[in-house]
Amino acid sequence: MNKIAIYPGTFDPITNGHVDLVERALNIFDEIVVAVSTAYGKNTLFDIRIREQMIKEVFKDNQRVKVVSFQGLLVDTAVKHNACAIVRGLRAVSDFDYEFQMSSMNNKLNSDIQTIFLTPSEKFSCISSTLVRAVAIHNYKRVDEFVPECVFREIKLKYSKE
C-alpha cells in the first residue's frame, strides 16, 4: 500500500521553497498530494485555477505528485485522497504556534492522520509567498530566483501590464 501525504497551502504563488519541501517529502512518502486551498477570506494574487495550473506545470514530470484544489476541512480532503499524513513546513519558531494549533485540531478531527513537520533547506528558509508578492509589487524582475520559471512568467504577465 502506498504511503500518501497531503501538502496543503494557498501557494499564492508556489515558491522554490515549496517545491523543495515536496521533493524532500517524496523521500518519506510514495506520493504527495499538493492541495491548493481556495484561500477563503484572503485576497489572492492569482485565482485558484491559475495557482493549480502553475503547480501542475512545476511537477508535470513527476508522476508521484498529484495536484488538487480544495475547500472545506483539510482532514476531509486528506481522507478523500487516502493520505495518512499532512506535511507542513516550518521556516521559523514563529511558524510553530500556528502550525501546532492546526496540527492539534486536525488530530482531534481525525486521529488517523498524522502531521509531519519539515524544516526548509537553508537556502529557502527566508522565502515565503508573502515576501515574493511584496517584492513583486515593487520590482517583479527581482523574484525570479525565488520561484519556478513558469511562476515567474505568470508574475511577469501580471505586473508588466501595470
Swiss-Prot record:
Keywords from the named record: ATP-binding, Coenzyme A biosynthesis, Cytoplasm, Magnesium, Nucleotide-binding, Nucleotidyltransferase, Transferase
A Pfam family it matches: CTP_transf_like
Keyword ATP-binding carried by entry: yes
Needed co-factor(s): Mg(2+)
Pathway(s) where this gene product acts: Cofactor biosynthesis; coenzyme A biosynthesis; CoA from (R)-pantothenate: step 4/5
Enzyme class: transferase
GO biological process, one term: coenzyme A biosynthetic process
Cellular location(s): Cytoplasm
InterPro entries the record matches: Cyt_trans-like, PPAT, Rossmann-like_a/b/a_fold
Family named by the database record: Belongs to the bacterial CoaD family.
Function, in words: Reversibly transfers an adenylyl group from ATP to 4'-phosphopantetheine, yielding dephospho-CoA (dPCoA) and pyrophosphate.
Name of the featured protein: Phosphopantetheine adenylyltransferase
Lineage, uppermost ranks: Bacteria, Pseudomonadati, Pseudomonadota, Gammaproteobacteria, Thiotrichales
GN (gene name): coaD
